[in-house]
A protein has these predicted regions:
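Glycine-rich, positively charged active-site loop/lid region within alpha/beta enzyme cores that binds
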Residues: 169-192
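Surface-exposed cleft-lining segments at the edges of enzyme active sites
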Residues: 125, 185-196, 223-225
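Catalytic alpha-helical scaffold of carbohydrate-active enzymes acting on polysaccharides/glycoconjugates
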Residues: 1-127, 132-176, 198-220, 228-262
Length: 262
């Protein structure tokens, strides 16, 4: 890495996996017939995405939205709104199905179809985040074949890097900076408590500062249906402000971080 723009010490990106109903169907296909379960995803599209966009506009931040193709088909007006606000659109599957559950030919079809749908909104899609951050043995080869610039799925570094023998960059992520492990609740399992905003604030602030001190890139992963709850949306804005106050951190899209891969 040659350094971050403007002499910044580190980079950061705010990313949003706009899964809507698809995440619940991907978790259990039987959920397709459970309106109560799916309504959690509908909230993400109906209420939370506009709240998130308002926060980003107030803070002057350009983010990356990873969107399954089927979500774009179901909620095209929301995708158009995201595009109109100038945010990066990136690939998140056609359905929210892990590549590990698909034969190679079906994974390829999902990759091609999802991208075609997203690019029908007038944007170039160069980034890929798989559902559940899972990569199959053929995923990186498919990304290379179809000209994707970057993947944002692995947890083996804190700096963007290039895959060996590949033109595909990796923009690393980590569960600690994902809202789902802290806030997600699935009534089918009842196995975890819902964390408080203050617990997550402490964890995220310490992680961001630690990555900054090491000169890395912090990629925050949020889901509108999770972070966009009324008691959390204010926390999102406060956390973005906290990162902005670290004036030696360059805030960018995931695609822009990928351009600085070693």
């Amino acid at each position: 890495m040659t350094g971050w723009p403007g002499g910044a010490r580190a980079g950061a990106a705010f990313t949003f996996d706009f899964d809507a109903e698809e995440v619940w169907i991907g978790e259990d296909p039987a959920n397709a017939d459970k309106p109560g379960v799916l309504s959690q995803g509908t909230y993400g599209a109906k209420v939370a995405v506009p709240l998130v966009l308002d926060v980003l506009e107030r803070r002057g931040v350009r983010a990356t939205f990873f969107i399954p193709g089927r979500v774009a088909e179901r909620h095209p007006d929301r995708v158009r709104e995201i595009v109109a606000k100038g945010h990066e659109i990136a690939h998140h599957g056609y359905t929210h199905t892990s590549p590990l559950k698909l034969p190679p030919e079906e994974e390829e079809r999902e990759l091609v179809k999802g991208r075609e749908i997203l690019e029908s909104f007038g944007v170039k899609v160069s980034g890929y985040r798989s559902p559940s951050w899972d990569l199959s043995p053929v995923t990186l080869g498919l990304l290379e074949r179809y000209g994707f610039a970057y993947s944002s799925n692995l947890m083996d570094d804190i700096r963007p890097y290039r895959h060996d023998g590949s033109g595909v960059a990796e923009v690393p992520i980590q569960w600690i900076l994902d809202d789902a492990p802290h806030f997600w609740f699935d009534a089918a399992t009842w196995t975890k408590k819902i964390s408080t905003v203050e617990e997550v604030r402490s964890i995220w602030e310490k992680e961001i500062v630690g990555i900054r001190d090491l000169g890395g890139a912090a990629v925050v992963t949020c889901h509108p249906q999770i972070i966009g709850r009324p008691g959390r949306i204010g926390f999102l804005e406060e956390f973005i402000a906290f990162v902005q106050d670290l004036d030696d951190v360059w805030i960018a899209t995931t695609g822009e971080l990928a351009e600085h891969a070693a």
